[in-house]
Amino acid sequence: MLFRSAGSLGKKLLRVTDVMHQGGDLPMVQHDAKLRDAIMEISRHRLGITGISQDGQLSGCLSDGDLRRILESGHMDLDAPVRELMHSNPMKIESGKLASEALHVMEEHKIMVLFVYEGTENNIVGIVHMHDILQGGL
């Protein structure tokens, strides 16, 4: 007979909602924000990314990797509108999914963060970082 610890099974059933950041912990700036505002939001939340919101919906994202590439290009304008610099199709996962599924998506796409949605894909309710999943025991 095979016995499995309840803790091990519980960790495998961990949901994205169990480890996601939400509410005031969700990094987000408005579509018309300046690059300097996005940098401050990324720094404040320490997740390496900020969402870009237009009319209450996720319209894009900007990551610390994007910032490094902008800096390397020599065209760093802190007053540039973030909408001109953002990725318009950020990676997302549905809130009811298992954390292990989120981890698989992150590994497959070589990313550290997924936006979490509920209902429609632009209804963002949180963000999950790979470190949060791994600290959860996966």
Q: Which stretches of residues belong to each language-model region?
A:
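The conserved cystathionine-beta-synthase
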Residues: 28-46, 71, 92-112, 116-120, ...
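Short, surface-exposed loop/turn motifs that are enriched in glycine and acidic residues
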Residues: 5, 24-29
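Helical hairpin unit composed of two closely spaced alpha helices linked by a short loop
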Residues: 46-51, 55-90, 95-97, 101-104
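Glycine-biased, small-residue-rich flexible motifs in mid-sequence functional cores and linkers
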Residues: 7-12
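Bateman (tandem CBS) regulatory domains
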Residues: 13-26, 79-90
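Short hydrophobic beta-strand motif reused across regulatory alpha/beta modules
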Residues: 53, 60-65, 112, 125-133
